């Protein structure tokens, strides 16, 4: 192979390498942007955390992911996802920032009960019997109930409790949980008053930004 041809091959190899590096860089940027958008709030404890994600904004839902992990191995022990309608999430955020939920929590805490009752809870939800069967999630034919609530905490002002139980779909399609026994999954995430406010602000700002972007990009029904 003569010298000129070798130089040309080296030049082509260099160009291909530059293109490959560019593609990898763009993919990395794309991944970073996706992570930033999809995961917009997080509350952590020593062995649990709750993340709030925008993955399901396109279907009008906010995704709350709860995880419990082993502190030594840092591996996940239990996890569950709960979906909330956007408008319900906005109402939840407003109830926090307006002081309604903190006031209810203070009133409940003042009763002096060892285990204060929840002052707020998500609507009944989960996976119905048909989908459970299709996905092979249970062998008893029951639905899966998933919800979480917020109550006054012991060491922290507030604690989120996410629970999964067997359930049954009612005539309205809501999944009624069975309370005759311990939950199959239970994950608690305690938080401070400031963390709760930050969560509410993040929910509001991200949903409002998403909806504003829909209007800006004309991503709405124009047939009316």
Predicted regions and their residues:
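Mixed-charge, glycine-accented linear interaction segment located at domain edges/termini
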Residues: 161-224
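A short, structured beta-strand/loop element
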Residues: 51-74, 157-172
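OB-fold ssDNA-binding interfaces and closely related basic DNA-contact patches used
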Residues: 21-61, 94, 106-108, 117-140
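Compact, well-ordered interaction domains used in eukaryotic information-processing assemblies
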Residues: 70-76, 80-106, 110
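Short glycine-rich, low-complexity/disordered patches
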Residues: 98-127, 209-224
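Short, solvent-exposed interaction modules
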Residues: 116-185
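Heptad-repeat coiled-coil amphipathic alpha-helices that mediate oligomerization/assembly
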Residues: 2-23
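A cross-kingdom feature marking solvent-exposed beta-strand/loop segments within repeated
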Residues: 66-85, 174-188
